Each structure stands twice: as structure tokens, then as C-alpha cells.
Amino acid sequence: MALALLRRGASPTDAQRRGRRRRWPIVVAVLAGVVTLAACATFETVDYYWQGAAGQIELLANSQPIPDVIGKSDAALAARLKRIHEIREFASRELGLPNNGSYTRYTDLGRAYVTWNVFATPELSLKPRQWCFPIAGCVNYRGYFREAQAAGESKRLKAAGDDVYVGGVPAYSTLGWFDDPVLSSFVSWPETEIARLIFHELAHQLIYVKSDSAFNESYATTVEEAGLARWLASRHDSQLDKLAARADHMRSVFRDLVRTTRTKLSEIYASNASDDDKRRAKHDIVAAMKAAYESAKQGDPALSGYDRWFAQQPNNAALAAVGLYTDRVPAFRELLHEANDDLPTFYRRVRELAARPKRQRDAALDALAQRAAASAMTAQRSGTRTN
């Protein structure tokens, strides 16, 4: 995930990266300038810009070089940071991801998440609201460095009649404009999940399309999947393989539940039924999803990892947030498959897609998804497996 307030329409050039550390003394002035540019906007908008700028400054100011942290940490944290260093080097060396200062420093947040993202949809629609910014373009969420501020925005949107979902974010990407640090919010995760996260966030630094969250997140999710497969192959650790397979299974069960629910809701919302009938159907469909989840947990208690998501009472906004990360993944997987699993070729073709107008880009992704579905059906019939 990329932070809306700080990202640009493209990643910085090599020359810009080399100048980053020289620019650090004026980072505060630069970010304050963002707030100044918003002076003609509403107080609410200015306040939003300010909390983002202040949060980023605090995050970077409190970071420390990982070697320094290792030297004064307990054995468990030191071991984790050393492993993260290996993952970071692997990302650039083997996956062709940016080689810069990101994930070479560590920040202890003192809280569970670095930001909280607020997603919203109309009551009877799965189309997420968008918020547009002069620098960042349009995104499908608003990010806050303080949970109370996210809760306040959630309350405001709910009062306007929207479905709202607030999700804690363990990490985000500034697309290479700053050296994104390793955060305490994810440092204790399993190795496989840390690898996924780092590969995902670095993928955002490599390619980013302004105002197309679904493209950006699905592309980065595909990179994290491909990266993890290569990381596991390099580790030769059967326990890690089992851990990754287990996590993949849980994701698959969860995503299938969400996909099925979204399909049913989409059909209802597109129908000629009255709004009251749509509301009743929505209630029943979401209740059925929750019941299916509880049933699945009885057969596999490990699925309880998604309890937090279900505890918020799933709604359109929660379902839409999941979709941003998964809807286009089959298309990008197919693109990687057609590139013979060669990442440089894949990146080149993703850039070609990114350069197209959105309508053409979406049409190309639809065609890729159709080819992926056809290949999967053929493989199923023949008893083989693709991708």
C-alpha cells in the first residue's frame, strides 16, 4: 500500500534518490509546503494534509540504522532484523526491485499499526469512494496516523449514510521518495509474511499508476507472490514451505468467501429490486458469509486469523477493500506466466500496460483474466496445473 499524501505520479529518478539524504534537512519544509498549498481548501482538508505530513516526519525522525538496533537489542529482535536484511538484499538482487535505503532502518512505533485507512462505499454499491489530491491523484481510502482521527472520519461518513471500513495498516510505501523503515508493527510476523510485505511495498516503488488503486495493489500482490516463491526456493526450509502453504490456504478460503459474497451482492445491487428489498438481501448475504466463515473455522481453527476482519461487521466497504488487492491478481499472474515467469520481462509489460489510458488498460487486464480462466479450466480437465 502506498501513502496517499506523499506519493507522486511516478517514482523518483536515480538522481533524485541520490539527493534524498542531502534534502533531509529540508524535509520538514517540503512537507509543510504541502499544507501551505492546501491553504485555499477547507479546514478539514488542511488538517488532513497536516496530520499526514507530521506523521511521516515523526516516522522518519524516530528511525535508526538497523546495525545500530541489532547491537543493542535482545537476541530475538536482532535475529529478526538480520533476516529482514537478507530479505531486503534478496529483493534487489533476485527480484529486480529497487536498491535503495528502504528497509535499512528500524522504527519502534509503540503502537499496533503505522496508519489506519478508512474505506467507504454507498449503502447499496460495492464501488469505493475516491478522494483526490493535487499530488497523489485519486485513491480509494484516506489514511490517518492516529486511530482516533480515522474513527472520526469513519463516524462522519457513516452519518452521511455510507458503509465504512477502518483497517489498520502495518506498512506503506512512499514510492522511494523516502527511505521506508522496518516497523515494529510487522517485525514480529512470520518470516514468510515479512518477505511478502517487503516485496509488495518495494514493488510499488518500481511501478505505480496514478489514480488506479486496483491496478497498483493487484500488481504488487502478484510480485509478492512470485517473490515469496523464489525466496522459499532459496531457503530450502521445509518448515517455511509448510508455513507459507498454510497461510496461502487461509488466504484462499477467505478470498473465496469474499469473492462469492461480492458476486451475490453485485447481482442484487444491479437488479430492479426496491432499495428495501436490496437491504434485506444484503443483510442475508452478509449473514451467510459470516456463517460460512464460522463453519470453516470449526473444520480448521487456524482460519481464526480473520476474526478481526469479521469483528467489524463486514459491509460493502470492507468487501471493496479486499477487492482492491485481489481483483486483478489473476490477470497479472497470467501476464507473468506469459512472460515465462521472467520478472524483468513482466515488469516491462506491466509498464507498457501502465502507460495506456485506463480504459485500454482495463480491457487488456480483462483479456488476460479471461485467458487465465481458460487455462485454469483446461488444466482442470486435463488434471494439470498452471501458474
Tell where the protein language model's regions lie, with residue ranges.
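Short, Lys/Arg-rich cytosolic juxtamembrane segment immediately N-terminal
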Residues: 14-24
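Bacterial N-terminal signal peptides
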Residues: 28-37
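Bacterial Sec signal peptide processing site at the extreme N-terminus
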Residues: 36-60
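Metalloprotease/metallohydrolase-associated module, dominated by Zn2+-dependent proteases
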Residues: 47, 59-60, 192, 217, ...
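Solvent-exposed, acidic/flexible segments
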Residues: 59, 77-84, 143-150, 187-196, ...
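Acidic/histidine-rich, surface-exposed loop or edge segments in extracytoplasmic proteins
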Residues: 59-73, 131-139, 311-313, 330
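Acidic/His-rich structured neighborhood in mature extracellular/periplasmic domains
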Residues: 86-251
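Pan-zinc metallopeptidase signature
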Residues: 256-387
